[in-house]
């Protein structure tokens, strides 16, 4: 059985945590929140996930700073996920670039990436009730579960 962990930073409305829980349920992963600063599990796991919301076109700074401090590894399987105000495949590639680059430079092999919309009340949006209310929704959760199942086949 594959041993999996997910490093998670979920802020505001816990959108990314909902997605992390869905993926974790399919790959039997332990979720480690970044504020715990726990990296020991990395040594013994086969698959590592990294998830955080997107802010200004990249993962939250807390996730990027955490990734920078990780030890180097050799060809360890990893995946990236996020929630954001706007979703498209092209945007996901761009938004994940900073974290992907850090992880690849540390020796991780990225085997999958996932993104979906999340409820957003940042900046002026709070005055209008936000955007993407109800997201991630049931379809997003199902897609995250399917993503998790695909990770096990990689």
Describe the residue ranges of each PLM region.
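FMN-binding flavodoxin-like domain, especially the glycine-rich phosphate-binding loop
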Residues: 2-4, 11, 18, 22-34, ...
């Amino acid at each position: 059985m594959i041993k999996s962990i997910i490093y998670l930073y979920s802020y505001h409305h816990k959108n990314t945590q909902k997605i992390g829980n869905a993926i974790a349920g399919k790959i039997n992963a332990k979720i480690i929140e970044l504020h715990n600063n726990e990296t020991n599990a990395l040594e013994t796991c086969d698959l590592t996930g990294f998830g955080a919301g997107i802010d200004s076109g990249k993962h939250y700074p807390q996730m990027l700073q955490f990734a920078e401090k990780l030890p180097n590894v050799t060809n360890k399987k990893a995946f990236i996920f996020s929630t954001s105000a706007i979703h498209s495949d092209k945007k996901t590639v761009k938004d994940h670039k900073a974290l992907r680059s850090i992880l690849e430079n540390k020796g991780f092999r990225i085997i999958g990436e996932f993104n979906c919309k999340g409820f957003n009340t940042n900046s002026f949006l709070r005055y209008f009730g936000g955007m993407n209310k109800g997201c991630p929704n049931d379809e997003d959760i199902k897609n995250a579960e399917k993503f998790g199942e695909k990770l096990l086949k990689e």
